[in-house]
């Protein structure tokens, strides 16, 4: 990634600027606060594909990361005073949030308004003016912290739906910066997006960037249409390609590029971890602990209503009832990571899923031999990889998902060319993983038929499918995703910095 050249002359206010040439802006910092037995608070690095992909660039280019550290802070004055956290050589700048910020900006507008709307209104979005006002206020704080962090002429990469207003705000504060934005969740169809009372403000916010990126070409096309419809902007009319043939929005002052950049995983690292003898041994132990069944079905998800956990449970129960899956030699393991536990719809979902699991085990299980094994807690990385290796069929059945990296992780783990991937058509991953067993999660009979086919696939068919899937996942990793976006951002049309 290279600089796009002269951004204009510096001003007398440059003494207030930061010294970071490359700044990542995300809702969360890549750290968690941990309390030691003596009560001391320390910061511990949290795992994640995004920081893994960007860490080399952050180190090479005097990089910094702006985000919320995950700690609710009602005692500190929420001014613009920046105190950095240095963790493993990375410089992190916290944006402090208080109880009201978390309730209204994060749990409210981000996750009870935008999240359900962008995921096809599986749950009805809630619109509150107070939530919107808090969203604007918190986005402004992120922009102000970033403005004070970035060096003159630097590059800023804003991440995801919680921060859609930051590009425009930052553009006004710092016209010298090169700004990119990437949306990690689906961008909705036009008719759904138009429901948002603040639809124009969101599109204007995103258009503060030089490059706006989505997982899929459909999201890019929807965004181009909305830019024409809501703002009267001139836009390109041709189809947007994947990492190519970018769309353009031509505004009075500048041109914004729009593209599709499917995100991925650190597939080579996962493939290597799978080969560890301890992971292999743990995979064998998992099968033994489950009673050495003939087939293990696996689901791995955040506990979220978009993930279709109830669909796979219902399909599995009916397969057992119809004798198409045998209760004495087939088990389903569902690993559900806790998520947004203070949001009401998530509380209801957890109760529903756990009731469903109990009903299936009560109907088809035996004492000491449940047919569904359900864990509602975070799973350590090596343990998760062992589950991937141990399982025979991976069930990825979201009703809507921007990409779904679990599907790619499973494929990266299967260097034995075993296993089968059942994958929802409504994930971004389905556009790339065409040799999976693709399924419509809204068609229960189709889900059942597909799971049955995956359970009974022949070994040669399994190898053929998995070999093709692995070629795709290993070649298109998270490093390629990040570099393709940042290369395109570096080549975007330059703006006048004045």
From Swiss-Prot:
Associated pathway: Glycan biosynthesis; trehalose biosynthesis
Assigned keywords, A-Z: Glycosyltransferase, Transferase
Annotated GO MF terms: alpha,alpha-trehalose-phosphate synthase (GDP-forming) activity; alpha,alpha-trehalose-phosphate synthase (UDP-forming) activity; trehalose-phosphatase activity
Positions of UDP-alpha-D-glucose binding: 48-49, 302, 307, 405-409
Pfam families with a match to the protein in the record: Glyco_transf_20
Keyword Transferase applies: yes
SUPFAM superfamilies cross-referenced by the UniProt entry: UDP-Glycosyltransferase/glycogen phosphorylase (SSF53756)
The organism's place on the tree of life at top rank: Bacteria
Signal peptide: none
Name of protein: Trehalose-6-phosphate synthase
Organism: Mycobacterium leprae (strain TN)
Source organism phylogeny: Bacteria, Bacillati, Actinomycetota, Actinomycetes, Mycobacteriales
């Amino acid at each position: 990634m290279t600089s796009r050249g002269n951004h204009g002359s510096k001003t007398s206010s440059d003494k207030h600027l930061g010294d970071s040439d490359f700044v990542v802006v995300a809702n969360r910092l890549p750290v968690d606060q941990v309390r030691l037995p003596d009560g001391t608070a320390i910061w511990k690095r949290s795992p994640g594909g995004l920081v893994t992909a960007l860490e080399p660039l952050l180190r090479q280019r005097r990089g910094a990361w702006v985000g919320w550290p995950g700690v609710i802070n009602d005692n500190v004055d929420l001014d613009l005073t920046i105190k950095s956290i240095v963790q493993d050589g990375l410089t992190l700048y916290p944006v402090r949030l208080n109880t009201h910020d978390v309730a209204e900006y994060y749990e409210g507008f981000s996750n009870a308004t935008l999240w359900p709307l962008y995921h096809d209104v599986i749950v009805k979005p809630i619109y509150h003016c107070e939530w919107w006002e808090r969203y604007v206020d918190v986005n402004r704080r992120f922009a102000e912290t970033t403005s004070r962090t970035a060096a003159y002429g630097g590059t800023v990469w804003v991440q995801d739906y919680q921060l859609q207003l930051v590009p425009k705000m930052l553009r006004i504060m710092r016209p010298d910066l090169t700004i990119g934005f990437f949306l990690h969740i689906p961008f909705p169809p036009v008719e759904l997006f138009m429901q948002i009372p603040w639809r124009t403000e969101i599109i204007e916010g995103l258009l503060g960037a030089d490059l706006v990126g989505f997982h899929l070409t459909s999201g890019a096309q929807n965004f181009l249409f909305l830019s024409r419809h809501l703002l009267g902007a001139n836009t390109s009319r041709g189809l947007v390609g994947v990492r190519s043939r970018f769309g353009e929005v031509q505004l009075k002052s500048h041109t914004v590029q729009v593209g599709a950049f499917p995100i991925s995983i650190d597939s080579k690292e996962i493939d290597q971890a799978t080969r560890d003898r301890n992971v292999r041994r743990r995979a064998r132990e998992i099968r033994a602990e489950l009673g050495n069944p003939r087939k293990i079905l696996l689901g791995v998800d955040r506990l979220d209503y978009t993930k279709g956990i109830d669909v796979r449970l219902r399909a599995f129960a009916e397969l057992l009832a119809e004798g198409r899956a045998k209760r004495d030699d087939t088990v389903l393991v569902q690993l559900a990571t806790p998520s947004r536990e203070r949001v009401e719809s998530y509380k209801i979902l957890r109760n529903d899923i756990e009731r469903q699991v109990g009903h299936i085990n009560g109907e088809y299980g035996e004492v000491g031999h449940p047919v569904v094994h359900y864990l509602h807690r975070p799973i350590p990385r090596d343990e998760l990889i062992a589950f991937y290796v141990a399982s025979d069929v991976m069930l990825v059945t979201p009703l809507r998902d921007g990409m779904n990296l679990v599907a790619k992780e499973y494929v990266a783990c299967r260097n034995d060319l075993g296993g089968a991937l059942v994958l929802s058509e409504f994930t971004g991953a389905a556009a790339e993983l065409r040799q999976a067993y693709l399924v419509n999660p809204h068609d229960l009979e189709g889900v059942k038929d597909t799971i049955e086919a995956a359970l009974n696939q022949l070994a040669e068919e399994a190898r053929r499918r998995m070999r093709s899937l692995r070629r795709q996942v290993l070649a298109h990793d998270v490093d390629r995703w990040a570099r393709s976006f940042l290369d395109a951002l570096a080549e975007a049309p330059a703006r006048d910095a004045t």
